[in-house]
Amino acid sequence: MSVHPTQTLSLSQYLIEEQLKLPQATGDFTALMSHLVYAAKIVSREVRKAGLLENILGATETVNVQGETQMKLDEYADKVFNHTLTRSGHLCILGSEEHEETVPVPNGYKIGKYTIAIDPLDGSSNIDANVSIGTIFSVHLRKSPAGTPGTLSDLLQQGSGQRAAGYVLYGSSTMLILCTGKGVSGFTLDPSCGEFILSHPDMQIPETGGIYSINEGNYNYWSDEVKNYIRDIKSIEGGRKPQSGRYIGSLVADFHRNLLKGGIFLYPNDTKSTKYPNGKLRLLYEAAPMAFIAEQAGGMAVTVYGERILDLTPKELHERTTLVVGSKKEVEHFLKFAPKKS
């Protein structure tokens, strides 16, 4: 069933209303978000028909900077977001999971005052299984002088300083979850009018939840502390109700379910591979934006050692971290088991 745009609030209307509340607003942020959303709509369209097009679905021969084989849709999404955002006139520099170095604004285009760090297509290894995937982004205000090309230091800022963060979930419907530091709002794409409509205002994650999300296939490689925590929440001692395990393998999808229903998502480090001693998720464009959303929705986000994610400042573009995020009381319970950082 389609939603009539005159009876509800579109994302465009929402952004303008928020802009009018700030006397100092210039409209730059609103315009930047419009470009990002435009790119997301294009990617959403391709995701929906990916199974029909042989040249969109599946892997390419290239390997990205993370050492991961790029899926064709991954590559496509990266090109769409890069082209749209760097030519928007509101961005000074872009950081992407798919590029080893930062992506500058092309010659001849206006240099703006914002930075964006982005994972163009999170969970892309699940594309051919038709599992929900998504785009994650983080927005900062530049630190370098206005009008000059952006620098890496403009991107490497503490998570608590984010001007906005969000994700687009490409699932049974396409949703945008947006946080500008004043709560969390959810928008659903109405295909009949091509607009994101405010469907989930003032989102709050339940304080507790009965769901835990972790890749239990790595159990034997975890620290004893993480093993003890998982055993505890699965225990039925004393008549307790054990928590239910739900793990999709797509950060956006797992986080989104827990945001709505309550629960906890964990991605600890392990000894399975020496390649990721500090965890596998990227701090700048995965952990930090999700932490920003979680805290604004009343939840918590920490490393496996109990450090607040938003207090961390990345030292490099693709810095990795552990992540424990979700309902406040569930994360607090995890902290009782958290290992000490050596």
Swiss-Prot record:
EC number of the protein: 3.1.3.11
Residues engaged in binding substrate: 122-125, 215, 247, 280
Alphabetized SUPFAM superfamilies for the sequence: Carbohydrate phosphatase (SSF56655)
Superkingdom as given in the UniProt entry: Bacteria
Pathway: Carbohydrate biosynthesis; gluconeogenesis
Gene3D superfamilies the UniProt entry points to: 3.40.190.80, Fructose-1,6-Bisphosphatase, subunit A, domain 1
Cofactor(s) demanded: Mg(2+)
Matching PROSITE patterns: FBPASE
GO function terms (MF aspect): fructose 1,6-bisphosphate 1-phosphatase activity; magnesium ion binding
GO cellular component, as recorded: cytoplasm; cytosol
Locations listed in the record: Cytoplasm
Binding note for cofactor: Binds 2 magnesium ions per subunit.
Binding site for Mg(2+) 2: 119, 122, 286
Protein residues bound to Mg(2+) 1: 97, 119, 121
Catalytic activity: beta-D-fructose 1,6-bisphosphate + H2O = beta-D-fructose 6-phosphate + phosphate
Subunit structure: Homotetramer.
Family: Belongs to the FBPase class 1 family.
Protein name: Fructose-1,6-bisphosphatase class 1
UniProt source species: Leptospira interrogans serogroup Icterohaemorrhagiae serovar Lai (strain 56601)
Gene name in the database record: fbp
